[in-house]
Each structure stands twice: as C-alpha cells, then as structure tokens.
A protein has these predicted regions:
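Bacterial N-terminal signal peptides that target proteins for export
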Residues: 1-11
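Bacterial N-terminal signal peptides
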Residues: 9-20
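Hydrophobic/aromatic beta-strand patches that form the interior of the parallel beta-sheet core
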Residues: 208, 247, 337, 369-371
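Sec-exported extracytoplasmic/periplasmic mature domains
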Residues: 215, 233, 237-241, 276-280, ...
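Active-site segments of SGNH/GDSL-like serine hydrolases
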Residues: 287-292, 322-356
C-alpha cells in the first residue's frame, strides 16, 4: 500500500468506528453541563512516527491528566472515548481529585466507577460516561483525572496539543497515589478523556468553542490557560455568568472540509460528536477554514504528509460547509456563532478567499451571531497580517494578548441570550 493510500485508510477506517456511537446532548440528564472538554484525534499508525507523533508507553501504568473546569458543581462524571481505535480500551481503575503541583494531588482521590464497576473495557469507537462522583468542583481550579491502564494498553487516540503538562507513572497501580514521585514521564497531550461534566442545576449551559489551532491555543503559554476559550470563560464569570461553561474543541491543523491523518477528521464530520453531544450545550462558536485555504497550496511531502489531501477550496465551498454546520446545530436546538478568519499573511489569491468568506460571515449568512476576530487582530495599516502585539511570532497564531483580545470580541450579551441567560 502506498503511503498516501495508508493515510486514507487511517482516516476512513477511523470514521467507521466513530460515527455510529454519537449521542445527542439533548439526551443528557437535566442539570449536567460540560465544565471541560477536548476533541480527540487518531495517532498516525506508523512503524516509525516522527517525534511529534510518538506516544508514551502507558501499558500497566497510571495516566494522570490535569483539567481546569469552567463551571462549578456539586458532583462530576467523566467521559472516556475509544474513538478511532481498532482495539479495545481497558481501564482497570479511575479516580478524580483536586490537583496540586505537577502530578501531585491536593485532595483525596475519589474512585470513579462505570456502571458500578471499577474497571471497564470499551469496544473500538465506543464512548462511555462514568457514574456520578460526589465531589465539589470549583471553576478555574485544577483537577486530576487518573486512569490505570490495562497491561497491554497502547495509546491510539489523543488530543495532540494540550498546552498542559500531563503525566504517566512508573509501572504498577498508582491511580490514587497522592504524590508526584512516581509520575516521571511528562507529555503534552490528552488521551481518552473527552469531557468532565458537573451537576450544576437546571439553569446551567455550555458553549462549545470549536476550531483549529487558533482555538486550540497553539503557541499560548503552557500550563497558564491563555487560549481564547479560557479567556472567554473568565470573561463570562466576571460578567456574572458563572452558570455558563466553555468547552475547547479546537484541533490544531483541523480543516472544515478535509480529513487528515495528523489533524483529525474534518469539522464537517466531527461537529456533531465533538460539539453537539456536549452535556448542556446551548451554543457553539465556530472558527474554521484558514487551513482549508492554506494547505491546498502546500507541496506534497514524502513520509507523513499531514496536509494531504491538498484539496483546492473556494469561498463558495467553505460557505456551503458552514451552512451544513449551522443546519446541524439548529437541528439540535443549538445556536451557532460564526467567527471571522484571522489574518495569516497569505498570498493574494488565498487572501481574497479569506476576505470573501469573512464578508459572508459578517453579513449574517445564517449564523445566529458573529465574533469578528479578524477585526480585532489585524494590523490597521496592513490588514492581511496580525498586529505585532497580538502575534506570537509565526504570523499566524496569536500571542496570549491576542487570544485575550479574541475573547473580548465575543458578543457576550448575545451569547448569554442564546443560552438562556446567566
């Protein structure tokens, strides 16, 4: 099989295992809301992957992942996923606790059970929510989700860019260990855990922020929660909307219309699973399309060609993709806000496509609201590039200050109205 054919097999095979198992958020019990979430993607299945795509050894070890909920609650549950895998996922035990410094715990580890059992095995493609856990969850504080992995478990699915240090223990059962000494392996991905939901009362709601690396927070400060969805969550809290959680469902490199072996399935394919299935979701903010415009012009690469397929797009094809997202959201009773594509210093032809897409987004175009990220980030003298103070240094991804400016551009009052108030 050629490499290009193998890439297609990875992506298309993954889709077979995922799509039948998506559940609607409307089926979630009342009063539960996603306080934290991430979008998972397959790890390229290669004999000798590049360093960026090498997963740590997790067999018979505890994996401890640090998450920051955006809304408080009096009980919690986690969702684990075996999406994109061709083998079962075996979790021998799980726990949830307040996190301390590094991999250390600041509170007692509370066991997490699945159907009353400590261990669980998920079939390929299966997602599963845990039983509720009696634990007070405080928004903005770190929590550690620890999974004790099966003796032969391999990591086949992750969220590649976490901007958060997570940890793998030495071999053995360390799922409830309070100290950090045995968690010597550090990695900057999330694996298997796709959501932490809290029981927060009937008036609570979630906003799903979904996009590419700019939503993912690429090049923001590690362990500092400086992505724009983080800043939006803080802004909502400061405005008195403590009842609204924000889930970051960005995937670096993601495209609206094309799958990638490195950058996940297209948003057109993953939108319902990653955004519309979130507990308590009432609104989504969509920022996607710049990679569709840009990757088409990238030359094919030998080996792992993350930009494959190099599909040419037009403003019309992107707009058609947005309309499909809007229709899906409205079928689920979810309001959807469109975000304008941010400056990336593109050549004239690609820049013209970006500007045409932005004109459509600003005109309404079927979206329930607009977050004009382009307007706040662009250089007034050269609107095709980022303002220097908002540029992380690569001309594409914002700095911490740029991500904050993006959050400030979200129409919060309109967003609150869309989700049903504070």
């Amino acid at each position: 099989m050629s490499f290009r054919s193998s890439i297609a097999a990875v992506v298309l095979g993954a889709a077979v295992f995922v799509s039948p198992l998506v559940a609607s958020a409307s089926a979630a019990p009342a009063g539960w809301v996603a306080a934290w979430a991430t979008a998972l993607q397959p790890i390229p299945d290669l004999a000798a992957p590049p360093p960026l795509y090498r997963a740590p050894d997790v067999a018979g070890r505890a994996v401890r992942q640090i998450v920051y909920p955006t809304v408080s609650g009096r009980a919690a549950r986690i969702r684990i996923s075996n999406a994109y895998s061709r083998a079962p996922l075996v979790v021998e035990a799980a726990s949830l606790a307040r996190a301390g410094e590094g991999a250390a715990l600041a509170g007692a580890a509370v066991p997490v059970r699945f159907g009353g059992k400590a261990s669980v095995t998920l079939a390929p493609g299966q997602e599963l929510e845990s039983d509720p856990v009696a634990i007070d969850v405080a928004a903005g504080r770190p929590y550690a989700i620890s999974l004790q992995m099966g003796a032969n478990q391999r990591m086949t699915v992750w969220h590649r860019v976490s901007n958060q240090f997570n940890y793998v223990s030495a071999p053995g059962d360390h799922v409830s260990d309070p100290g950090a000494a045995l968690f010597r392996t550090r990695f900057t991905q999330y694996a298997w855990v796709s959501e932490l939901a809290v029981e927060a009362g009937s008036a609570r709601a979630n906003v799903a922020a979904i996009g590419d690396s700019i939503t993912d927070g690429l090049r923001s400060s590690v362990n500092r929660n400086r992505r724009w969805p983080d800043a939006l969550a803080r802004r909502l809290t400061a405005s008195g909307a403590e009842s609204i959680g924000v889930a970051n469902l960005g995937i670096s490199g993601n495209r609206l219309l094309s799958d990638s072996a490195c950058y996940g399935t297209s948003m057109a394919s993953r939108f319902e699973r990653d955004a519309l299935s979130r507990a308590g979701v009432k609104a989504a903010i969509v920022l996607i399309g710049i990679n569709d415009i840009n990757f088409a012009a990238m030359p094919p690469r030998a080996g792992l060609d993350c930009d494959h397929p190099h599909t040419q797009v037009t403003a019309a094809s992107l707009i058609d993709g947005y309309r499909r997202l809007i229709e899906a959201a409205h079928r689920h009773g979810v309001k959807v806000f469109g975000a304008t594509l941010t400056p990336a210093g593109l050549p004239a032809g690609r820049e013209a496509t970006r500007l045409e897409v932005n004109r459509w987004i600003r005109s309404g175009g079927g979206f329930d609201g607009v977050a004009d990220f382009d307007a706040v980030l662009r250089d007034p003298a050269r609107p095709s590039v980022l303002q220097r103070r908002y540029d992380s240094g690569d001309g594409i991804h914002p700095s911490d200050a740029g991500y904050t400016a993006m959050a400030d551009a979200v129409p919060v009052e309109q967003l609150q109205a869309a989700v049903g108030g504070k």
